[in-house]
A protein has these predicted regions:
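Conserved alpha-helical scaffold segments that buttress catalytic/binding sites
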Residues: 1-287
Length: 287
């Protein structure tokens, strides 16, 4: 298992070539430190060239800010983006923005407090996780120049990092570092994020076993004729299978991580709302 700590990204040909080569050839997880969210455009250019379809989960406190930044990304960068979920956003920083209908897996800060595990399925399904320091409470990132009293705790931020390491997320990005002045608390918080990411990767490598899947097929699961669900008996994880075979560049989205509740809802004859949003997004790419 190899790790790539690319340092602070710079928009130059040398680093772009390096990232493109890593994405094209490496089977390892990639960890990137990034100055600001706008640098994600640079990463998406490289994933496009590497023919990687992206499902992105962004952890940030402002939907308005994220929407403004993403609107400036090049059309080429967005060609192979399946989804951009934006979570941990705060209402007063997001009132003027909305998430496009084709995107899914976005959660307000209020829905995550004391139940950060809500993000476990979205992170498991994503191949790019972007964690911005804006999402943290000021008390846990005291060196941040822009002050936000509300946010995730360092412990919740660490759970996100570990989940990215433990699941199939290929690229994990810690961003917003341009807004942080080094001090003892901030350095400790950022170091913990990296530690728990690595801990997640190591834990996964130690516990991984060949999946033992039990299939549950639901006939007439509207709007589809049938949908197959799978439960991994080794870890009780659930997956919903997209009903037609996907092309190679989308094969990572054939089986969608979900919960038992998605299966229970769908067994009544209609696909669960979260899975419906995801399948609609895949439909748009395939058709």
């Amino acid at each position: 298992m190899n790790f790539y700590f690319l340092g602070i990204l710079k928009d130059d040909a040398q680093q772009f070539t390096l990232i493109n080569e890593i994405l094209s050839e490496s089977k390892c997880k990639i960890f990137i430190l990034q100055k600001e969210l706008s640098d994600l455009n640079f990463i998406l250019q490289a994933t496009d060239i590497a023919n990687i379809t992206s499902n992105i989960q962004i952890i940030h406190n402002s939907l308005s800010y994220c929407s403004d930044i993403i609107s400036k990304f090049s059309a080429r960068s967005m060609e192979q983006v399946l989804n951009i979920g934006i979570s941990a956003t705060q209402q007063h920083l997001s009132a003027e923005a909305s998430i496009p209908n084709q995107y899914f897996d976005s959660y307000r800060l209020g829905s995550l407090l004391n139940q950060i595990e809500t993000l476990s399925m979205p992170i498991a399904f994503s191949n790019i996780l972007v964690a911005d320091v804006s999402a943290l409470k000021q008390s846990d990132i005291t060196g941040r120049k822009t002050t936000y009293s509300s946010g995730l705790t360092a412990q919740e931020f660490n759970q996100i990092a570990r989940s990215a390491g433990f699941n199939g997320t290929q690229i994990t990005i810690l961003t917003g570092l341009n807004d942080v002045i080094e001090d003892e608390i901030s350095t400790d918080t950022l170091a913990q994020f990296i530690y728990y990411f690595v801990d997640g990767v190591i834990s996964y490598s130690q516990v991984w076993v060949t999946p033992h899947l039990t299939e549950f097929t639901i006939n007439e699961c509207l709007p589809y004729e049938h949908i197959s669900f799978y439960k991994d008996d080794n870890n009780n994880r659930w997956y919903a299978q997209y009903p037609t075979t996907l092309p190679d560049h989308l094969k990572n989205y054939q089986n969608v991580p979900c919960m038992y509740e998605d299966y229970a809802f769908s067994s009544k004859g209609e696909l669960s709302p979260r899975l419906m949003s995801i399948f609609n997004a895949i439909d748009a790419l395939v058709n």
